[in-house]
Amino acid sequence: MRHYEIVFMVHPDQSEQVAGMIERYTGSITEAGGKIHRLEDWGRRQLAYPINKLHKAHYVLMNVEADQAVIDELETAFRFNDAVLRNMIMRTKAAITEQSIMLKQKEERAPRREERSEAKPEAKSEAAE
């Protein structure tokens, strides 16, 4: 079995269906004896350029170990699913299990957002006095 990195982008109006899509795709990989080393849902992100007049998409990253037949099946599923805007499947030399840079950046920004949201109510209460 070979190692692959898979990234696919889903239409932003179909974001609520992403969990089901991930479950379906990971299920087909594990049923065929493959392994999922990393699965990251990056959420809705701004696109670098418009695709089909869309400026945002829902991103998902998977690092898997699977046979070529499973990857061909996944590629066909991506092609016939209208909600998938783009996909990229790359073969890697080894399994990648650490967090991606995108997810690390997202987690670094999360505490700052919480700090700002906590500071706003305090500022409003001071202004009311």
Swiss-Prot record:
One of its GO terms (molecular function) is small ribosomal subunit rRNA binding. It comes from the Bacteria. GO terms for cellular component: cytosolic small ribosomal subunit. This is Small ribosomal subunit protein bS6. PANTHER family: MITOCHONDRIAL 28S RIBOSOMAL PROTEIN S6, SMALL RIBOSOMAL SUBUNIT PROTEIN BS6M. Gene3D superfamilies: 3.30.70.60. NCBIfam families: S6. Belongs to the bacterial ribosomal protein bS6 family.
